[in-house]
Amino acid sequence: MGRSVKKGPFTDTHLEAKLMVLNAASEKKVVRTWSRRSTILPEFVGHTIAVHNGKKFIPVYVTENMVGHKLGEFSPTRTFKGHSVKAATEKSSKPS
């Protein structure tokens, strides 16, 4: 279930406050945050937010298409190394 429309979108207050200060001064600094749970608001468009993925900060440039999504969606936490090639070598090594 999604969040109630009555409540409105959730964003951490410290993140929203930092971006409002940057908007008022019309600055474009990179803002570092651990708040992957925050919803992207229209006021965030045009800013670069460095989102923590558990190991390092991934810079995310916010565009209009991202509004309504969570910051964590754009900072992957897992790296896919690929499946093992063991099954492929077993098939090719069988004598015919």
Swiss-Prot record:
One of its GO terms (biological process) is translation. Keywords: Ribonucleoprotein, Ribosomal protein, RNA-binding, rRNA-binding. One of its GO terms (cellular component) is small ribosomal subunit. GO terms for molecular function: rRNA binding; structural constituent of ribosome. It comes from the Bacteria. It holds the Pfam family Ribosomal_S19. Belongs to the universal ribosomal protein uS19 family. Protein S19 forms a complex with S13 that binds strongly to the 16S ribosomal RNA. This is Small ribosomal subunit protein uS19. It comes from Solibacter usitatus (strain Ellin6076). The gene is rpsS.
